[in-house]
Amino acid sequence: MKKVLVFAAFIVLFSFSFLSTGLTAQAALKDGTYSVDYTVIQGDSDSASMANDYFDKPATVTVNGGKSTVSLQVNHSKWITGLWVEGNAVSVTSKNASSDTRKVSFPVSTLSNPVNAKIKVDIDDDDLNYHHEYQIKLRFDEGSAKALAGAVKSSDNNTTTPATKSDSSNKVTNPKSSDSSQMFLYGIIFVATGAGLILLKRRAIFK
């Protein structure tokens, strides 16, 4: 009986690993421009960094040919004197001295996993003198992606098609082929589980 339970537990864990992989693959964004929520977390943990408050949300993500470029706004711009993402300095696209903000952009290799970054803070105030560099990570929430500019490019012919209301307020619809693959995977898992349980029961009977 213990062998049956162990086998069943293994199948369940194995199934979840495959399903999570499939969901990650389906979450990939088509070519287009999106608003995406994100959190600045500490470099060595999943906890929010103090720097999180210095980055305005959401970010704007442009996907072109499968490559993603992120644009976001930094507040307290005078304090944030340096920002590097995946080892490269970000590009400053605009500054606003009156609001003490600046917009930056940078390419990222992935949106599915936290992106390594480094920040440099220099504060020279009467009440505070602080100079430090430290590691952070940018954790993007692909599930929050909303299409912007009223259009999403088709990956088939690279043309731009109007986005429907559902595109602008919900996740990007997954292709039907992915749904079929998912159902096929469910079938394999179900058959394998049933066959394994029957085999183990037969062995138990003949012992």
Curated annotation (Swiss-Prot):
Binds both host hemin and hemoglobin with affinity in the nanomolar range and presumably directs it to membrane transporters. Gene3D superfamilies: 2.60.40.1850. The gene is hbp1. The modification Murein peptidoglycan amidated serine is found at S177. Keywords: Cell wall, Ion transport, Iron, Iron transport, Peptidoglycan-anchor, Secreted, Signal, Transport. Disulfide bonds: none annotated. It comes from the Bacteria. It is a peptidoglycan-anchor. Residues 178-207 form a propeptide. GO terms for molecular function: hemoglobin binding. Residues 1-27 form the signal peptide. A motif (NPKXZ sorting signal) lies at residues 174-178. One of its GO terms (cellular component) is extracellular region. GO terms for biological process: cellular response to iron ion; heme transport. Residues 151-178 are annotated as: Disordered. This is Hemin/hemoglobin-binding protein 1. It holds the Pfam family NEAT. InterPro entries: Haem_uptake_protein_IsdC, IsdA, NEAT_dom, NEAT_dom_sf, Sortase_SrtB_target. It is found in: Secreted, Cell wall; Secreted.
